[in-house]
């Protein structure tokens, strides 16, 4: 498996393009004014496996990370926010959540709970802390 996060994001995005998905939210990464980053993704393909959630991350001055899912009317959107030093985190967390949703979808049962998302976030954060600079997960 290719561990380059940008290559993974490109491949996943290509797999989602169906004539409709890309005209809606698709995937976007933009800067927030507080300042920080936000990754937004249309994850409606996984609607049956997600629940609405409220922001569940933590904020501590300039070191923060937040994430939540909005699911309604057969649409689902994932939002991952972080301070300016968290762009890499956002991308790897997104990949971890999508990989978990793929697993649930393939098994045909289960729900991605807030606790499971927190586990993914914590796991990614720990792996990034343990990864030497200049290398990838």
Give the positions of each predicted feature.
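Helix-rich interaction surfaces within compact, conserved domain-sized segments
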Residues: 62-107
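Basic/aromatic-rich interaction segments and small domains that mediate binding to polyanionic partners
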Residues: 127-137
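Hydrophobic residues embedded in beta-strands of well-ordered beta-sheets
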Residues: 37-39, 74-76, 126-129
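Short beta-strand-centered aromatic/proline hotspots
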Residues: 121
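Eukaryotic proteins' extreme N-terminal regulatory segments
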Residues: 1-19
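Amphipathic, interaction-prone secondary-structure segments
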Residues: 14-58
